[in-house]
Amino acid sequence: MLRIADKTFDSHLFTGTGKFASSQLMVEAIRASGSQLVTLAMKRVDLRQHNDAILAPLIEAGVTLLPNTSGAKTAEEAIFAAQLAREALGTHWLKLEIHPDARWLLPDPIETLKAAEALVKQGFVVLPYCGADPVLCKRLEEVGCAAVMPLGAPIGSNQGLETKAMLEIIIQQSTVPVVVDAGIGVPSHAAQALEMGADAVLVNTAIAVADDPVMMATAFRLAVEAGVLARQAVPGNRSTYANATSPLTGFLEALA
């Protein structure tokens, strides 16, 4: 069970809605993933249409919507998008994204912290997408963010946990949930993040661009479940030296 702010989730896998070939395929993949929290870019939704091709099937699926401010380049733009999302969707939950460079889509730490502080004061449940910077994550936690979402690698890159060393520090020091976001390319990346102690992962591109998104979503669901179980089982310590699983001492003594 995962708790963030006022909500609890059985699944530790969050999903996105971009890059799917159709809204039907998107919903089928989300259902196969078991995800209960789904991100939604406000720039992709036509709020004037109650039957929007993306929004309507998500509402019907009964998932918790997490609108995001993707496309915002400044704190001011992100705050405006957040207010629009709250008014249109009736939710105070928000994934805060501010990335001024469209080529790399790396989050702006200064603008993100500025916006997060303002949005928390306005009553939002803020989940900020941020770099894997332990100091920044602690500052975001201190201004009241409900969770932190450090990247594993650039958005959509499928590179995996390139920031593993920093993620380990963030996980160790955080008192709010840590959701590894961006760069996760295959189910084993997700399992590794959960084994490390992350509370959840957010996956979009890896599922949406697979030849079979529904099958890939199922694979991610199973990988996340395995990662959670592995962490709960408490793995043995790593050792520099070999440690025989079947010592032969007694057997050899019997032959003497």
From Swiss-Prot:
List of residues binding 1-deoxy-D-xylulose 5-phosphate: G156, A182, G183, N204, T205
InterPro entries, per database record: Aldolase_TIM, Thiazole_synthase_ThiG, ThiG
Catalytic activity field: [ThiS sulfur-carrier protein]-C-terminal-Gly-aminoethanethioate + 2-iminoacetate + 1-deoxy-D-xylulose 5-phosphate = [ThiS sulfur-carrier protein]-C-terminal Gly-Gly + 2-[(2R,5Z)-2-carboxy-4-methylthiazol-5(2H)-ylidene]ethyl phosphate + 2 H2O + H(+)
First-listed, main subcellular location of the protein, grouped into a coarse class: cytoplasm
Molecular function GO labels: thiazole synthase activity
Annotated metabolic or biological route of this protein: Cofactor biosynthesis; thiamine diphosphate biosynthesis
EC number: 2.8.1.10
Keyword annotations: Cytoplasm, Schiff base, Thiamine biosynthesis, Transferase
Compartment(s) of residence: Cytoplasm
Active-site residues, record numbering mapped to chain: K95
Subunit structure: Homotetramer. Forms heterodimers with either ThiH or ThiS.
Family named by the database record: Belongs to the ThiG family.
Name of the protein in its database record: Thiazole synthase
Lineage: Bacteria, Pseudomonadati, Pseudomonadota, Gammaproteobacteria, Enterobacterales
GN (gene name): thiG
